[in-house]
Amino acid sequence: MKEISTSSGLGGILNAFRNITKESKRITFVGTPGFCAPFAELIAYPIRDAGKELAFVANLDFDDAKRIVYTSHGMQMAENTDAAADTVAILGGLAMPKISVDVHALKSMIDRILGGDGMLIGVCFMSIFELAGWYDILDFDYMIDTNTSVKILEK
Protein backbone atom coordinates (compact mmCIF):
# COMPACT_ATOMS: atom_id res chain seq x y z
CA MET A 1 0.00 0.00 0.00
CA LYS A 2 1.20 3.54 -0.68
CA GLU A 3 0.99 6.47 1.72
CA ILE A 4 -1.51 9.09 0.56
CA SER A 5 -1.56 11.42 3.58
CA THR A 6 -0.39 11.88 7.14
CA SER A 7 -1.98 13.57 10.13
CA SER A 8 -1.79 13.41 13.87
CA GLY A 9 -4.02 13.00 16.86
CA LEU A 10 -7.48 11.61 17.22
CA GLY A 11 -8.79 14.12 14.70
CA GLY A 12 -6.50 12.61 12.09
CA ILE A 13 -8.17 9.21 12.49
CA LEU A 14 -11.72 10.59 12.57
CA ASN A 15 -11.30 12.98 9.64
CA ALA A 16 -9.60 10.32 7.53
CA PHE A 17 -12.45 7.89 8.14
CA ARG A 18 -15.10 10.51 7.36
CA ASN A 19 -13.34 11.46 4.11
CA ILE A 20 -12.79 7.88 2.98
CA THR A 21 -16.45 6.94 3.60
CA LYS A 22 -18.08 9.98 1.97
CA GLU A 23 -19.77 7.82 -0.69
CA SER A 24 -20.57 4.87 1.61
CA LYS A 25 -24.22 4.27 2.42
CA ARG A 26 -23.91 1.39 4.87
CA ILE A 27 -20.81 0.68 6.97
CA THR A 28 -20.20 -2.43 9.05
CA PHE A 29 -17.39 -2.36 11.60
CA VAL A 30 -15.84 -5.69 12.58
CA GLY A 31 -13.81 -5.98 15.76
CA THR A 32 -13.50 -7.43 19.22
CA PRO A 33 -16.36 -6.73 21.63
CA GLY A 34 -14.32 -5.19 24.44
CA PHE A 35 -11.43 -3.41 22.78
CA CYS A 36 -12.78 -2.52 19.33
CA ALA A 37 -16.45 -1.74 20.02
CA PRO A 38 -15.70 1.62 21.71
CA PHE A 39 -13.40 2.54 18.81
CA ALA A 40 -16.18 1.75 16.31
CA GLU A 41 -18.51 4.05 18.25
CA LEU A 42 -15.84 6.77 18.36
CA ILE A 43 -14.98 6.49 14.66
CA ALA A 44 -18.70 6.54 13.80
CA TYR A 45 -19.30 9.80 15.69
CA PRO A 46 -18.13 12.22 12.95
CA ILE A 47 -20.52 10.59 10.45
CA ARG A 48 -23.50 10.45 12.83
CA ASP A 49 -25.52 12.96 10.76
CA ALA A 50 -24.45 11.72 7.33
CA GLY A 51 -27.47 9.44 6.79
CA LYS A 52 -25.40 6.27 6.78
CA GLU A 53 -26.53 2.99 8.31
CA LEU A 54 -23.93 1.69 10.75
CA ALA A 55 -23.43 -1.77 12.23
CA PHE A 56 -20.93 -3.63 14.41
CA VAL A 57 -20.04 -7.32 14.20
CA ALA A 58 -18.18 -8.74 17.18
CA ASN A 59 -15.41 -11.12 16.11
CA LEU A 60 -16.96 -13.36 13.43
CA ASP A 61 -20.55 -13.34 14.72
CA PHE A 62 -22.23 -12.22 11.48
CA ASP A 63 -25.72 -13.15 12.69
CA ASP A 64 -25.50 -10.98 15.82
CA ALA A 65 -24.66 -7.65 14.17
CA LYS A 66 -25.79 -4.62 16.16
CA ARG A 67 -26.88 -1.24 14.84
CA ILE A 68 -24.78 1.74 15.91
CA VAL A 69 -27.03 4.72 16.62
CA TYR A 70 -26.57 8.29 17.82
CA THR A 71 -28.08 8.93 21.26
CA SER A 72 -27.90 11.69 23.85
CA HIS A 73 -24.92 9.76 25.25
CA GLY A 74 -23.05 9.52 21.94
CA MET A 75 -22.85 6.56 19.61
CA GLN A 76 -24.24 3.36 21.12
CA MET A 77 -24.90 -0.25 20.11
CA ALA A 78 -28.60 -0.96 19.62
CA GLU A 79 -30.80 -3.76 18.30
CA ASN A 80 -29.73 -6.51 15.92
CA THR A 81 -29.44 -5.61 12.26
CA ASP A 82 -28.38 -7.06 8.94
CA ALA A 83 -24.58 -6.93 8.60
CA ALA A 84 -24.67 -6.48 4.80
CA ALA A 85 -22.92 -3.26 3.75
CA ASP A 86 -21.09 -1.49 0.95
CA THR A 87 -18.17 -0.70 3.27
CA VAL A 88 -16.44 -2.82 5.91
CA ALA A 89 -14.08 -1.35 8.50
CA ILE A 90 -11.88 -3.97 10.14
CA LEU A 91 -10.50 -2.92 13.53
CA GLY A 92 -7.00 -3.86 14.65
CA GLY A 93 -7.92 -5.73 17.81
CA LEU A 94 -8.84 -8.70 15.63
CA ALA A 95 -5.17 -9.14 14.66
CA MET A 96 -3.82 -9.10 18.21
CA PRO A 97 -2.14 -12.43 19.07
CA LYS A 98 -4.31 -13.02 22.17
CA ILE A 99 -7.49 -12.70 20.10
CA SER A 100 -6.39 -15.03 17.29
CA VAL A 101 -9.26 -14.52 14.86
CA ASP A 102 -8.78 -16.79 11.84
CA VAL A 103 -8.03 -14.30 9.06
CA HIS A 104 -9.32 -16.69 6.37
CA ALA A 105 -12.66 -17.03 8.18
CA LEU A 106 -12.68 -13.24 8.52
CA LYS A 107 -12.08 -12.88 4.77
CA SER A 108 -15.06 -15.15 4.07
CA MET A 109 -17.24 -13.06 6.37
CA ILE A 110 -16.07 -9.81 4.73
CA ASP A 111 -17.05 -11.27 1.34
CA ARG A 112 -20.46 -12.17 2.80
CA ILE A 113 -20.96 -8.66 4.23
CA LEU A 114 -19.93 -6.95 0.99
CA GLY A 115 -21.74 -9.38 -1.29
CA GLY A 116 -18.67 -9.56 -3.51
CA ASP A 117 -18.30 -5.81 -4.09
CA GLY A 118 -17.48 -2.92 -1.80
CA MET A 119 -14.76 -1.12 0.09
CA LEU A 120 -12.54 -2.61 2.81
CA ILE A 121 -10.91 -0.25 5.31
CA GLY A 122 -8.49 -1.23 8.04
CA VAL A 123 -8.19 0.88 11.19
CA CYS A 124 -5.34 -0.08 13.48
CA PHE A 125 -2.55 0.97 15.78
CA MET A 126 1.16 0.30 15.28
CA SER A 127 0.84 -1.51 11.93
CA ILE A 128 -0.78 -4.60 13.52
CA PHE A 129 -2.36 -5.77 10.24
CA GLU A 130 0.94 -5.54 8.40
CA LEU A 131 2.85 -7.27 11.22
CA ALA A 132 0.25 -10.04 11.35
CA GLY A 133 0.63 -10.66 7.59
CA TRP A 134 -2.96 -9.68 6.84
CA TYR A 135 -1.99 -7.44 3.90
CA ASP A 136 -1.25 -10.66 2.01
CA ILE A 137 -4.73 -12.08 2.69
CA LEU A 138 -7.15 -9.14 2.90
CA ASP A 139 -7.43 -6.73 -0.03
CA PHE A 140 -7.63 -3.45 1.89
CA ASP A 141 -8.68 -0.41 -0.13
CA TYR A 142 -7.53 1.92 2.64
CA MET A 143 -5.58 1.59 5.86
CA ILE A 144 -5.74 4.10 8.70
CA ASP A 145 -2.67 3.16 10.70
CA THR A 146 -1.78 5.22 13.74
CA ASN A 147 0.85 5.16 16.43
CA THR A 148 0.42 6.23 19.99
CA SER A 149 2.81 7.64 22.48
CA VAL A 150 2.10 7.64 26.17
CA LYS A 151 3.37 10.10 28.72
CA ILE A 152 2.55 9.59 32.38
CA LEU A 153 3.03 12.52 34.70
CA GLU A 154 3.11 12.58 38.44
CA LYS A 155 2.88 15.44 40.89
Pin down the residues of each PLM region:
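Long, charge-dense
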Residues: 39-98
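Gly/Ser/Thr-rich loops at beta-strand to alpha-helix junctions
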Residues: 10, 29-41, 93-98, 125-130
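Short hydrophobic beta-strand segments
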Residues: 26-31, 88
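Domain-start "cap" segments at the beginnings of catalytic or binding domains
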Residues: 34-53, 129-133, 138-142
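Glycine-rich, aromatic-bearing surface loops/beta-hairpins
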Residues: 80-155
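Residues at the starts of beta-strands that form the adenosine-phosphate
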Residues: 26, 53, 119
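Short N-terminal or domain-adjacent regulatory/targeting segments
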Residues: 1-24
